[in-house]
Amino acid sequence: MSIRVIIAGFKGKMGQAACQMVLTDPDLDLVAVLDPFESESEWQGIPVFKDKADLAGFEADVWVDFTTPAVAYENTRFALENGFAPVVGTTGFTSEEIAELKEFSRAQDLGGLIAPNFALGAVLLMQFATQAAKYFPNVEIIELHHDKKKDAPSGTAIKTAELMAEVRESIQQGAADEEELIAGARGADFDGMRIHSVRLPGLVAHQEVIFGNQGEGLTLRHDSYDRISFMTGVNLGIKEVVKRHELVYGLEHLL
C-alpha cells in the first residue's frame, strides 16, 4: 500500500523537488499540496489547499514541510494533532520547540523527523566533524547558502556545533583579548566555537568545518550543487517515519 503524502510549501524550490520525487516513486502517493498563495484549486490533478485547517481529518500518512521558519513549528504541531507523521526540512526551531514536539509525538504515538539537512553527505560531514572534535577542539564553521535563505546560521551549522559540543573540550576559540573592529566580524559564538554565515546568489547549500592544531589543519567540506541532493534523504524520511513512534531531530537517527 502506498504511503499517502501531503507537501506543505509545494511552490518553493525544495517543495517542487519533493513533489517530483514523490510523483516518480510508485511506493508514494501525493494526495494533497498546501500553499497559502496558490490561486489554483488543483496542481497536476492533485488538490491544492490554501489553509492547513482545511486538511484536518484528511486521509494521509505523512506531512512533508518545506515552508518558512515562521510557521514550521505550528505546521508540525498541526500534523501531529491530525495523525500525519511530519517530515520537516524547514529550519529555525528552538531546542525547546523540538523537545516539546518530541514529547507530543510520543503522546500521539507518531513518528516524525525534523532534519537540518537531508543530504546524506551533509549527515556524514556532521558525523566526521564530531569524531574530529574529540581531538581538535579549535574549530570554526563556515556555512554558505543562497541569498534567499531567511535564517542564519543554518540548521546544519547549529546541529554540527551541537554534536561537536557534546564531545569537544569547551574552550573559547581565538585570542582571549581579541577585539572586533566591526561588530560580528568573528561570527556567532556557540560554546566557544565560531560560526560564519555566507549568503550569495548562485549558491545552494555548502558547509566547511575547519580544525586547527599546532602545525596542522583539517578541513571537512560538503557541497550540495542541486536540490536533488536532498531528495534521497526526504524519501528515506517519508518511508521511515511511518514505522516509528517518536519524532527525531536529525536524519542520522533513521540511518
From Swiss-Prot:
**In the record, what terms sit under GO molecular function?**
4-hydroxy-tetrahydrodipicolinate reductase; NAD binding; NADP binding; oxidoreductase activity, acting on CH or CH2 groups, NAD or NADP as acceptor
Instruction: Identify the GO cellular component terms for this protein.
Output: cytosol
Keyword entries, A-Z: Amino-acid biosynthesis, Cytoplasm, Diaminopimelate biosynthesis, Lysine biosynthesis, NAD, NADP, Oxidoreductase
Question: SUPFAM superfamilies, from UniProt?
Answer: Glyceraldehyde-3-phosphate dehydrogenase-like, C-terminal domain, NAD(P)-binding Rossmann-fold domains
NCBIfam families referenced in this protein's UniProt entry, alphabetically:
dapB
What does the protein in this record do?
A: Catalyzes the conversion of 4-hydroxy-tetrahydrodipicolinate (HTPA) to tetrahydrodipicolinate.
Query: What is the official name of this protein in its record?
Result: 4-hydroxy-tetrahydrodipicolinate reductase
Q: Which organism is it from?
A: Streptococcus pneumoniae serotype 4 (strain ATCC BAA-334 / TIGR4)
